[in-house]
């Protein structure tokens, strides 16, 4: 238990802070620009999450293979996965920056940025794209640090970036009145602090950065194979956000979009807490898996389930009690605040199911069960889209809200079936 807490507690705290990190721009912009600014960030944020998810996926893929190979006694091969992951992070940063700058207009249209939302969304997104490298590396190196026993240091670097973001948001958005641009610059400079701190750790701890990468292409494929699941876990809430925004706009207008922005900000912290438990327990699961200790893997996973459920229950209680305060925090209108409070209980009903599927998925990719992890990750957005095409036709806007919960319940059912299949296969 002590070793479990040593890995999980710093990870949970770090992701809790990154959850607040994610809503800081919304807080400052919502209270400065108003509902339209809040909606603009909400609409374009899936692209920002795509960048960060790419870093998370590559970093986690490299970290899992590094830990497993070391546990199997193949140290040099494991070290090569670190070098491969870092080079892949750089390549991904360059490609994402170029693609997003070239296709900015069609991407904005695809995201549904229309009317008064579009110019504000473009202003925010363009600056965030300029900082792609900071975001990809800030999220990509952290899993490597955590798998090297540096969970506490990873937490410190994330706290430093978070603190910088708050200070700069206050300065740029409220004092200098730079609006959307100020919020974007504050975010990427905060990520730059985390990235620099991570490189300091890499240098001080002498992680295997320099040297050759034998079978580079093969290792890239293996990193991607493992990383698709954590990439999807980070991106999935934003895919869901994209779907929800489009259907909220169709059935409830800009008021529903602004309301879901408030709800999504509140739920983001919960989702990231679950990610903190899953990613925090991953190094131990990968280590025991590499050592062939199946019972230890199950023990760590069971502790992760219990921790995630306790956190989910606590968050459900807090969000329920403050459901009519969320809109006020983000400077929303009275209509948006009322709609947010009325809809929040529906979303809270799915959190325990989400916690189960999230930890189950982490266990799958930590033990190289890529197919099962893919199914768990991508089932939720696919099911959500199917439900959004059906349920709102009957229940209108309430059907949009309900579709999210139903998709989480069904995904948890799929995860449970796959978990049972895994147990039978091991036996």
What are these regions (language model features)?
Residues 20-39, 108-115, 171-178, 238-269, ...:
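Helix-terminus/linker motif at the lipid-water interface of multi-pass membrane proteins
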């Amino acid at each position: 238990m002590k070793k479990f807490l040593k890995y999980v507690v710093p990870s949970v705290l770090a992701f809790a802070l990154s959850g607040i990190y994610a809503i800081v721009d919304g807080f400052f912009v919502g209270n400065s620009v108003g509902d339209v600014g809040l909606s603009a960030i909400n609409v374009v944020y899936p692209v920002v999450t795509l960048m960060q998810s790419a870093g998370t996926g590559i970093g986690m893929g490299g970290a899992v293979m590094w830990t497993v190979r070391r546990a199997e006694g193949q140290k040099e091969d494991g070290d090569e996965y670190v070098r491969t992951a870092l080079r892949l992070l750089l390549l991904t940063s360059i490609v994402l920056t170029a693609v997003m700058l070239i296709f900015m207009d069609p991407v904005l249209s695809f995201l549904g940025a229309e009317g008064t939302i579009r110019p504000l969304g473009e202003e925010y997104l363009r600056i965030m794209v300029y900082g792609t490298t900071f975001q990809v590396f800030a999220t990509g190196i952290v899993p490597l640090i955590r798998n090297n026993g540096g969970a506490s240091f990873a937490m410190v670097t994330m706290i430093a970036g978070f603190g910088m973001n708050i200070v700069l948001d206050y300065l740029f958005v409220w004092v200098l009145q730079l609006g959307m641009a100020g919020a974007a610059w504050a975010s990427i400079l905060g990520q730059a602090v985390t990235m620099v701190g991570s490189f300091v750790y890499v240098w001080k701890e002498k992680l295997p950065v320099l040297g050759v990468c034998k079978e580079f292409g093969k290792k890239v494929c293996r990193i991607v194979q493992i990383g698709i699941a954590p990439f999807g876990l980070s991106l999935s809430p934003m895919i869901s956000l994209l779907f929800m925004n489009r259907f909220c706009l169709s059935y409830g207008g800009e008021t529903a979009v602004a309301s879901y922005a408030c709800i999504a900000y509140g739920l983001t912290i919960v989702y990231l807490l679950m990610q903190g438990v899953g990613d925090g327990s991953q190094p131990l699961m990968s280590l025991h898996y590499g050592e062939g200790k199946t019972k230890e893997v199950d023990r760590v996973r069971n502790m992760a389930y219990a921790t995630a459920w306790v956190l989910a229950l606590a968050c459900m209680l807090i969000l329920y009690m403050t459901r009519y305060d969320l809109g006020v925090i983000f400077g929303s209108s009275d209509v948006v605040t009322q709609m947010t409070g009325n809809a929040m209980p529906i979303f809270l009903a799915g959190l325990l199911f989400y916690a189960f599927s999230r930890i189950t998925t982490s266990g799958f990719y930590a033990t190289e069960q890529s197919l099962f992890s893919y199914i768990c990750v991508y089932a939720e957005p696919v099911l959500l889209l199917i439900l959004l095409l059906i349920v709102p036709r009957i229940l209108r806007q309430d059907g949009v809200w309900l579709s999210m919960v139903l998709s989480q319940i069904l995904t948890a059912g799929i995860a449970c079936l796959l978990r049972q299949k895994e147990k039978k296969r091991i036996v």
